[in-house]
Amino acid sequence: MPYTLSDAHHKLITSHLVDTDPEVDSIIKDEIERQKHSIDLIASENFTSTSVFDALGTPLSNKYSEGYPGARYYGGNEHIDRMEILCQQRALKAFHVTPDKWGVNVQTLSGSPANLQVYQAIMKPHERLMGLYLPDGGHLSHGYATENRKISAVSTYFESFPYRVNPETGIIDYDTLEKNAILYRPKVLVAGTSAYCRLIDYKRMREIADKCGAYLMVDMAHISGLIAAGVIPSPFEYADIVTTTTHKSLRGPRGAMIFFRRGVRSINPKTGKEVLYDLENPINFSVFPGHQGGPHNHTIAALATALKQAATPEFKEYQTQVLKNAKALESEFKNLGYRLVSNGTDSHMVLVSLREKGVDGARVEYICEKINIALNKNSIPGDKSALVPGGVRIGAPAMTTRGMGEEDFHRIVQYINKAVEFAQQVQQSLPKDACRLKDFKAKVDEGSDVLNTWKKEIYDWAGEYPLAV
């Protein structure tokens, strides 16, 4: 049969990006160049593998598959079902749990939606949850609100009450959390963080959840790769539900997973009968059709590939080095006289206080960007406003993926220290009536030979390390 449409149309759909859309292709190449020649210290970022990219760019993206394996709303899903089941099996294996005790949803599209989907599955509107206070290292999706405004949609749909860290130590104040939880009686206790560098005491969290009758939900988005590798403790022994993104330390595609308990939850003290978990159907229903339509099948395939990699000895070697590199950050910052929130790290990142240096995180972030270092400004305990964050968050996973070791991370800290000193000089040079952030940026944008020199050094140095594309 002849091809009905024109040859031009055939060429349109079969030609590569460089030929059909050079403008988009050029921007992509510019971004690859930036990644190749920059030091990426964003704690939530990583560089995924070539094989994950291979899986992402496949015709699996063409297929609609609303529903779950064996129960789809469309035909033609034989191979899509195989892929999703494989991904689920690999997810359980990667985190060392078995299907008799745990199930997993791999369709959820991202971390914050995954958390909302869990809440909606097990709570009615305006029921209560508790999560770590955002400026103390928590996350928006754990119910953040200010005195005057509900910031996260979670805090709009549900009532939230934060727990805090001890302001002296920077460690979660479990005693106060327990007292407040018993009084507040949340339906869900969230154990998870986005800028907390110490290990969470999951056993204590379980005890607190039991005392107030709450589900214990662990959000391991930042540390799931470390957990899969077995280099830090796992929450699965204690949690009822575990959520994670898939693109941070796990080093997969951008996505998320929701793990949920199966089997016996408790024994009824009056009847002696087993009380079973009822999480699987509510969570799956919350994901689809509650919040989503068709899943992203190309992402599920890429996640399956990443999970296979996460079960290898090479992945454990990588995560072990991540911890070593984070400790290298800790030691070098301390040697230079910086204060670290919680006095250090047990994980993949450090949170550096800049209050003692007389500058804030936004200014240091801006200087670092000028010299090809990507990190992020971050609130620290005691900050009065998220608009003036008192610190910077610095992570090790991305540059560890590219092959950097402890000595490289010592050198990175030296450059960050130079950026802090440069920021101090710029800020001190500004008149009192023109010292806002926009004034600071304008002054920096006037140009500096020193910044240009540092940028060239980092450009060349970062370019020595491989970048998978």
Swiss-Prot record:
Family statement: Belongs to the SHMT family.
Chain positions found as Phosphoserine: S26, S429
GO MF terms held by the record: glycine hydroxymethyltransferase activity; pyridoxal phosphate binding
Record's subcellular location: Cytoplasm
Modified positions (Phosphothreonine) in chain numbering: T20
Keyword Ubl conjugation: yes
Biological processes per GO annotation: glycine biosynthetic process from serine; one-carbon metabolic process; tetrahydrofolate interconversion; tetrahydrofolate metabolic process
Top enzyme category: transferase
Gene that encodes the chain: SHM2
N6-(pyridoxal phosphate)lysine modification, residue list: K248
CDD domains reported for this sequence: SHMT
Cofactor: pyridoxal 5'-phosphate
Alphabetical list of InterPro entries matching this protein: PyrdxlP-dep_Trfase, PyrdxlP-dep_Trfase_major, PyrdxlP-dep_Trfase_small, Ser_HO-MeTrfase, Ser_HO-MeTrfase-like, Ser_HO-MeTrfase_PLP_BS, SHMT-like_dom
Cross-link annotation Glycyl lysine isopeptide (Lys-Gly) (interchain with G-Cter in ubiquitin), location: K456
Record function comment: Interconversion of serine and glycine.
Protein name: Serine hydroxymethyltransferase, cytosolic
Lineage top rank: taxon: Eukaryota
Organism of provenance: Saccharomyces cerevisiae (strain ATCC 204508 / S288c) (Baker's yeast)
